[in-house]
């Protein structure tokens, strides 16, 4: 929607918002700060200041727009901020890869990416009517979720509003979460942890990928 300075593309979102409002469809909006970024943002010549200014403009205007739509109840503020090994997701060379350019904005004095704190600050300031979600990908990788939990608790301790924790349920036949007792138990513990800390828990996406070719009965 705001791929580069001075350029806005609201048409698709406006059409979607008009539809859900007209039909009174309770909705959540997935428009977070994260890897889903423009080639301008991923360009290797970008400076942290340029990225901060563009992100600030984007999150401010998006939050204002969503705040005025009564059927929008939740918004993902940041997405895929931490790798499955528990590291901060950052930039990569080129502009055609899965990367998170916003980490280049810098780290604060506590070693937390500035963009994460700034995104929640802006969303809270401009979308008081919408619940704010910290969204994450991956499976049940312990190192990743430990870092996620640590970051969410840090944000709450510093006074940022975080209303929920989201997990993208991208299931695969070679990572059998549904058939793995330990993974299911960990998911249950993760949901309990969210609730114990006053957070909603959302499965923000759900799909099942079959990589086996041809697929066997076991994959199905």
Annotated model-derived regions:
Residues 1-140, 199, 210-214:
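Substrate-binding cleft and catalytic face of glycoside hydrolase catalytic domains
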Residues 17, 38-64, 130-220:
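Non-catalytic scaffold segments within catalytic domains of secreted glycoside hydrolases
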